[in-house]
């Protein structure tokens, strides 16, 4: 199926009578602080990154078994819907498994992923952007090029990691200090022309995941720029469509947009061509963006994930689109990740939580991770058999120490994310709010925490 931009343009340019009862459409934006970029470019860029991150970037994988890759065994896999092309030539974009799209596709929009250590724990998360987004005429297109986004405090360790694994790979690795990344929310549904009928799932996501060759992927990226950021082709370097833990039936209106460093306000680049109504540009404080993300249960960056502390499946990478692959062969940290997935033995997951009296936690360092307790008793676990009497037992047995059910990982105001035992997550999903608490390490105050997955759900695959 070839991408036909005229079909979508006709759908996007429908005009109806303006309705003053609609709220004014808004373009919400925030420059994300503390982010840095590393460029990886060259004929081996895809193979190089595919062996280091959790996402699958190569449609062709030479495998001897699920855990080894042997270049002497030519068992080449390629999905029949993906057209044949040389991964080493041309700036063709990025391959996505399509774990939520019923099949793989080629795109020029980025992928969320992670670097793991040898024990399978997350070193850092990353967004991998094909760059530049729209490949302006005259742009270098001889080889694939990708931008890796990470926290600025981790860019040096990440660069060293890449250089250490480079060996004989034909890639160039360079830090990019001339870029900015923006959180953008495009409120298309509020335009009166659409009468609240716009759907990012139908109008953007479905066309994007139907593209199976590099030419259609490039046309789609150029169409996106022309429709939403007309005239800004040379200043938009990359884009990521953020669907992490959003309702899969509706999808998201959130993008990460990478621009050249001379862009002081991305709202000045926003120029929607499919509507005539005026758009209100709103600059959103970063704390609001972060709290909204925490309400979805999404951690981001080494300051929140804390390097080498959690497994990718514990922070829900398997629930995000194309963030982790279980059949692509070897990559650093793959063995434990694949085994955990295959055996189904995962005891904890991250979940959004509501913090009561959060002011008492404001003075704590962001690195503090407090044990999470609850007095709630799950009925099935409350009927354990009585221990057999022993003549050697103490007459005054010590009371059992209360065991935590998880850890509070991150808090901003009343919004937080906790790593919680799965049994409590399932209970909250079926029965509603579970009251928990943490104890302030300095004051001893008991701070209530609520797990309420009926109001702040973890969205499972469709």
From Swiss-Prot:
Q: Where in the cell is it found?
A: Mitochondrion matrix
Q: What keywords would UniProt list here?
A: Mitochondrion, Transit peptide
Comp. bias regions, Low complexity: 382-394
User: Could you tell me the superkingdom of the organism this chain comes from?
Assistant: Eukaryota
Drop me one GO molecular function for this one: transferase activity
Question: Region (Disordered): which ranges?
Answer: 382-405
Q: Which GO terms describe its cellular component?
A: mitochondrial matrix
What coarse category fits the chief subcellular location reported for this protein? mitochondrion
Q: Where is the transit peptide?
A: 1-11
Q: Name one GO biological process term.
A: iron-sulfur cluster assembly
Family affiliation = Belongs to the GcvT family. CAF17/IBA57 subfamily.
* UniProt cross-references to NCBIfam families, sorted A to Z: ygfZ_signature
Protein name stated in the entry: Iron-sulfur cluster assembly factor IBA57 homolog, mitochondrial
């Amino acid at each position: 199926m070839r991408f036909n931009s005229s079909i979508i343009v006709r759908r996007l340019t429908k005009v109806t009578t303006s309705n003053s009862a609609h709220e004014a459409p808004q373009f919400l934006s925030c420059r994300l602080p503390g982010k840095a970029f590393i460029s990886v470019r060259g004929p081996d860029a895809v193979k190089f990154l595919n062996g280091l991150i959790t996402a699958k970037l190569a449609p062709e994988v030479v495998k001897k078994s699920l855990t080894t890759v042997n270049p002497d065994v030519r068992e080449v896999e390629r999905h029949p819907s993906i057209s044949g092309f040389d991964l080493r030539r041309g700036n063709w974009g990025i391959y996505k498994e399509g774990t939520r799209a019923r099949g793989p596709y080629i795109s020029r929009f980025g992928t969320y992923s992670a670097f793991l250590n040898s024990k399978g724990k997350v070193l850092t998360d990353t967004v991998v952007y094909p760059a530049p987004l729209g490949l302006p005429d005259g742009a270098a297109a001889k080889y694939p090029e990708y931008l890796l986004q990470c926290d600025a405090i981790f860019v040096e360790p990440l660069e060293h990691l890449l250089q250490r694994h480079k060996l004989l790979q034909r890639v160039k690795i360079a830090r990019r200090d001339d870029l900015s990344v923006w959180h953008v929310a495009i409120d298309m549904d509020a335009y009166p022309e659409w009468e609240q009928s716009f759907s990012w799932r139908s109008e953007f996501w479905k066309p994007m995941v139907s593209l199976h060759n590099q030419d259609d992927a490039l046309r789609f990226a150029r169409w996106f720029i022309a429709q939403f950021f007309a005239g800004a082709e040379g200043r938009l370097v990359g884009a990521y469509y953020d669907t992490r833990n959003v309702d899969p039936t509706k999808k998201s209106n959130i993008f990460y947009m990478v621009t050249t460093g001379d862009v002081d306000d991305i709202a000045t680049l926003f120029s929607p061509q499919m509507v005539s109504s005026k758009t209100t540009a709103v600059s959103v404080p970063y704390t609001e963006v972060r709290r909204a993300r925490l309400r979805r249960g999404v951690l981001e960056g080494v300051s929140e994930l804390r390097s080498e502390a959690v497994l990718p499946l514990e922070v829900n990478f398997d629930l995000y689109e194309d963030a982790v692959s279980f059949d692509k062969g070897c990559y650093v940290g793959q063995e434990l990740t694949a085994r955990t997935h295959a055996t189904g033995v995962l005891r904890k997951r991250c979940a959004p939580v509501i913090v009561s009296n959060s002011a008492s936690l404001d003075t704590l360092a962001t690195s503090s991770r407090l044990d999470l307790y609850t007095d709630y008793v799950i009925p099935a676990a409350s009927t354990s058999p009585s221990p057999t009497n022993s003549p050697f037992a103490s007459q005054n047995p010590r009371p059992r120490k209360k065991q935590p059910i998880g850890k509070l990982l991150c808090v901003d105001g009343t919004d937080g994310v906790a790593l919680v035992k799965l049994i409590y997550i399932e209970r909250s999903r079926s029965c509603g709010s579970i009251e928990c608490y943490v104890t302030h390490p300095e004051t001893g105050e008991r701070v209530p925490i609520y797990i309420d997955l009926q109001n702040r759900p973890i969205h499972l695959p469709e």
